[in-house]
Amino acid sequence: IYGLSFVIVFVNVVLFDLIVYRENIKKVFPELATGCIILALLFGYGQFSLNRIRHELNRSEAMEVSLVQGNIDQNIKWNPDYQRESIELYQNMSLKKAPLGLGLIVWPETATPFFFQDPSHLSAVVRNIPKLTSDWLLFGSPSYLDEGSGTEYMNSAFLLSPDGNVAGRYDKSHLVPYGEYVPLRRFFPFINKLVAGIGDFKRGDGVKALRIGRHDLGVLICYEGIFPEISRKYKENGAGLLVNITNDAWFGRTSAPY
């Protein structure tokens, strides 16, 4: 991620200098040559990597995956009056496009706009979906942990087995600053008055692969996808599939998600 960001910025700087110094190309020739060499090396390495990945894919065991995107408007998502409608939408879409046999169905981050861990009719509906399709179901849900000092909230991903039981859970460990927590809040209590609307989530315990049969699944939640070290850690721990579940509905009809 960081290296690619550098290359994008560097190439744009070279193009800018070519325009500014178009009457004196010799002045920007060194950086132009450097840019061309970097792009050539990246292209060559990319081709080599793609060929290696194709070879590994041909040898790997396949799993059918269905990605379900409900496109629930953020303005109504957390309204209790629309919870049943949201889950019914995900249920219908999942049943329509399910792998039907030990595949994987993936819903987005916070797809269940309630605490799935609490026994309820809607939680039972969600648990019943993998039973109907005989597939695994991965989805995001808010969660909480009652401790002596109070209740801690997490941004979590749950994995349900084909029998509808919770096979694993991952709590987001790399939280969004000023979105899911406020840095230094413990040391500067007065910040609470300035950012009352900001979430204060509990950080998860770090990289934790979820087991699907004989395979390990690496789960990343939204913002965690920009940190390559997280994906690398999953790979080093044996994960054969990485899944990033995200809710970009916060951005509404803007260019931000793109």
PLM features: what roles do these ranges have?
Residues 79, 84-88, 92-95, 99-258:
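Solvent-exposed soluble domains appended to multi-pass membrane proteins
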Residues 54-68, 207-218:
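Beta-strand-turn-beta hairpins that frame and shape the catalytic cleft
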Residues 24-30, 66-68, 178-182, 203-205:
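A broad, low-specificity signal for short, low-complexity segments enriched in glycine/proline
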Residues 1-53, 88, 95, 253:
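Membrane-embedded alpha-helical bundles of multi-pass enzymes
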Residues 21-30, 54-60, 145-151, 165, ...:
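Short, glycine- and charge-enriched coil/turn segments that flank and shape catalytic ligand pockets
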Residues 37-52, 62-75, 245:
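Transmembrane alpha-helical segments
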